[in-house]
Amino acid sequence: MPFIAFNKASDPAAPDDLRINTDAVLYIEASRPDLLGETTIHLLGQGTVVHAVTESVGTVVSAMMRSPGSLVGCTRHYLAPQPEGGASTVYIAPANVSYTRPNHPASPDFWVVRFVDGSELRVIAPLPEGL
């Protein structure tokens, strides 16, 4: 279980004060403009609690790719109107996905990704390779 360190988005900032177990990552995405930090990390068993860090989504994804396992990028689906700037790309850890299922006849088509902790995420079809 490899750990990687990031700078938690806080005021005031503190260096390397968030160490996460990469095996516990569900998915990663760029933070919404109304949140602190550049990147939001969703962890296993945390429910709606997220961890915002000051590093860019590219830096966080790159650090995750150096550890065992991989991430799969896809476009998030929103039931509500999309945020300004459009839909975000989410990077999902397939090892923590219990199943995926299509939601037809929704328009546009999307998939429901169910994680091992019972949480769910919707992604726009087609489902990317690796999920």
Residue ranges and their predicted role:
Residues 1-19, 23-131:
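Acidic, Ser/Thr- and proline-rich intrinsically disordered linker/docking segments
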